[in-house]
């Protein structure tokens, strides 16, 4: 028998019995939290026009998208991200007076692993989007939803890391490097590759942003990390982002979530649409 007839494509897998049960149970728990908090479900097509992601501020490398063509020769992609299609829905199907809008999704995304690191090509995502609202209250709304979802999963020990996209963006902008070099720096910060980051930044030692960028992978821990970060820069955009993150952190601590929070200023995601608070849990 041809080996392609008995195996799955690279980055995919079959799920059987107990694995399916755990996956569906977790999905039900999280979506029930989202429904309780007033989020309504949307489902976007698994196949989208390539242009949707080419024109959006996603910065997702085109090599990571799984492509095909339709009968007219137009390029299609398997959905690599859920936020961008939801933004398309908001701009084409939702009236401005309906905002703010609370939407959630539970669907798979597909990304080719060009790094060769063995990452999954097909990834299930459950997420929430709060459209037409911003500021501290909106961020705290989404973050408290995340904490509630983690608690609902009966996790005794978990952490949610907090960062701010504006810190890296402001520092890299002041450095004045090409997009290719900026991406190398971002990858080093995100992976906490201190040695490689130091090698790249050596050419920019005289720049004001040098010390802060070099320190970013090490700036994780409790609230003291924010004070350390403030001592490394005088850039008003960076200090404003740090102060905002400090406000969010203090509010979450006052709400009783402090033991589950870790500050990580090395969070630097590839998606350009991240502009403010970022977080991830584990």
Predicted regions and their residues:
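Auxiliary tRNA-acceptor-end handling modules of aminoacyl-tRNA synthetases
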Residues: 1-20
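Positively charged, Gly/Ser-enriched RNA/tRNA-binding surfaces
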Residues: 19-37, 48-49, 68, 72-73, ...
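A short beta-strand-loop structural module common to alpha/beta enzyme folds
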Residues: 40-46
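Glycine-rich loop at the start of a catalytic domain that most often binds anionic cofactors/ligands
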Residues: 52-65
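Acidic, His- and aromatic-enriched active-site or binding-groove loops in soluble protein domains
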Residues: 64-71, 176-206, 257
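Short, conserved phosphate-binding/catalytic loop or strand-edge motifs used
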Residues: 120-126, 162-170
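Short, surface-exposed recognition loops or helix-turn segments adjacent to catalytic cores
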Residues: 157-167, 185, 262-268
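Short glycine/threonine-rich loop-to-helix capping motif typified by GTGT followed
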Residues: 169-179, 272-279
């Amino acid at each position: 028998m041809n080996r392609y007839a008995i195996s799955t494509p690279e980055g995919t897998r079959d799920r059987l019995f107990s694995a399916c049960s755990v996956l569906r149970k977790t999905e039900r728990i999280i979506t029930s939290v989202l429904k309780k908090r007033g989020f309504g479900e949307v489902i976007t097509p698994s196949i989208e026009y390539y242009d949707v992601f080419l024109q959006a501020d996603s910065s997702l490398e085109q090599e990571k998208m799984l492509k095909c063509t339709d009968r007219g020769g137009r390029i299609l992609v398997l959905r690599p991200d859920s936020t961008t299609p939801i933004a398309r829905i908001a701009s084409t199907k939702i009236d401005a007076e309906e905002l703010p809008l609370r939407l959630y999704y539970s669907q798979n995304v597909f990304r080719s692993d060009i790094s060769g690191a063995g990452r999954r090509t097909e990834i299930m995502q459950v997420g929430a989007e709060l459209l037409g609202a911003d500021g501290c209250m909106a961020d705290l709304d989404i973050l408290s939803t995340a904490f509630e979802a983690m608690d609902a999963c009966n996790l005794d020990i978990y952490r949610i890391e907090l960062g701010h996209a504006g810190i890296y963006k402001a520092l890299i902008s002041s450095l004045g490097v090409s997009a290719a070099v900026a991406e190398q720096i971002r990858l080093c910060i995100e992976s906490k590759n201190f040695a490689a980051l130091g090698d790249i930044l050596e050419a920019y030692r005289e720049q004001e942003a040098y010390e802060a960028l070099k320190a970013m992978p090490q700036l994780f821990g409790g609230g003291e990390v924010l004070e350390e970060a403030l001592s490394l820069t005088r850039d008003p955009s960076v200090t404003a982002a740090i102060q905002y993150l400090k406000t969010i952190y203090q509010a979450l601590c006052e709400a009783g979530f402090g033991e589950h929070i870790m500050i990580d200023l090395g969070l630097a995601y590839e998606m350009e649409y991240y502009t403010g608070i970022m977080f991830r849990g584990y």
